[in-house]
Amino acid sequence: MNIHSGTKKYIILEIVLGILVVVLAGSMLFQKKEKEFYKVAVVLPDSDSRQWSSLKYGLRMASEDCEANMVVISTDDIASMEDEASIIQFAIKKGADAVIVKPIPGADSEELLQTISAKIPVMLIGSSAGYNRSQSAYATTEADAAALVKQLVQEVLKDYGGDIRGKTFGIFSSDVASDVTYVKKGGVCSELERMGAQIDWKLTGNLNEDGLTILEKQKPVDVVLTLDDRSVVQAGTCSKENRLHGADVYGIGNSTESVYYLDNGSVKCLVVPDEFGAGYQCMTQVVHKLNGDIRKMEDQTVQYTVIRRSELFSERNQELLFIMSQ
């Protein structure tokens, strides 16, 4: 776990805000030369990561269709909703008319967003701000987490002749605290236990440089289930280097990196949420709100696709692969 001192956090936040000044100023000056479009700030952690490629492409396509100006803001090294809220408030001061945010979950996150939503429309993407999705006051666009893990287990069943009784499993998620993580972990454990499988270990957290070593030291299992894109990539890397003791890897992923490990056989199957659709729907609903739609913004659930190595480059998957590569 990385522990930031108060001074380091302050410096990081100042750097992020400084970069944001340049990005927003340049973007808004450009738009004034053309036409006064609505300005939508999109706040994502590690926004340059490939896991967001499909999402950003969907946001960009919708912003062009809806004639909105999109500015993507990264929250790299920002570990709390307080800091994320400061970045959003700064974006508002610089002219943002609405915000789409992947929130950093926390006990006070919903309350912090209230001061923002009182000024401009706020749409969440990927997870709610708190730990209980049903109690969230904000519209969220995301895949059905319970459906994703249920499908993941079904794919394992297909490869094991419909019977996984006595088979051993490891469960890995890089996302620590979101409501989506709780739903995924709870759902996959319930499914496996119901079918008589044995869960030997659960691993949670972004493992960074030590990831391969930590994974390698886990008890050998028959199957490793990875519940998000980063964990797919880390487990796929470990599998490729023969450091997972022969375990089959199945995962929920949406980046070209995840597909790479599927293509080379390190991952057996991917369940891919429609991140393009999530981005497109988010932006469309936000701009409709800015254009005077009096209806409350609503939760939106996107679909998913199952892809395997044998059909990776099929005609059905060509569009999906194209979107991932944008």
Each predicted region: which residue ranges?
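Hydrophobic membrane-insertion alpha-helices, especially the h-region
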Residues: 12-27
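Hydrophobic alpha-helical
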Residues: 101-118, 188, 203-259
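Hydrophobic alpha-helical segments within soluble ligand-binding/sensing domains
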Residues: 137-166, 254-258, 274-291
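Hinge/beta->alpha junction and helix N-cap segments in small-molecule ligand-binding domains
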Residues: 44-50, 73-82, 127, 139-148, ...
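Flexible loop/hinge segments that line or gate small-molecule binding clefts
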Residues: 108-144, 255-263
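Short beta-strand segments enriched in small/hydrophobic residues
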Residues: 28-55, 72, 135-136, 167-177
